[in-house]
Amino acid sequence: MQLTAYLHTAITVRDLQRAQAFYEGVLGLQLVHRALNFPGVWYEIGGVQIHLIEQPHVHPERPDPHRWGRNPHLAFAVKDLAQAEQELRAAGYPVQKSTSGRAALFTQDPDGHILELSQV
């Protein structure tokens, strides 16, 4: 087997409109317009897609509730980490700075999925 590309990650959300407000409004991701026969949306960044699929029961895995970076998470690069932190806090989203000492922080989407933002 020879893998040639990473295509997408799909995550489930309870309320699609609320999730879109976060992924589009706060993170600024661009919607990929696609006809779906179920409630969901696709986003694309850097050639990789994120699929949000609405489900009534969402339980993000959180084996380490105290160190968010040691849990399953999506990771994004940002130009200005301080600005990203300020925008997340202003929008009411929790922020946990990386304990590794690098320029990174973690936040949670409305369903509790963890996202890492790193300044690279």
What do these predicted regions represent?
Residues M1-R18, N71-F76:
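N-terminal beta-strand motif that seeds the catalytic metal site of vicinal oxygen chelate
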Residues Q2, E85-V120:
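Vicinal oxygen chelate
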Residues T12-I50:
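Core segments of cupin and vicinal oxygen chelate
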Residues L36-P39, R70, S100-A103:
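Short acidic/glycine-enriched loop/turn segments that link adjacent beta-strands
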Residues H57-P63:
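A short, acidic/glycine-rich surface segment
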Residues R67-L88:
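Mid-chain, well-packed structural core segment of small domains
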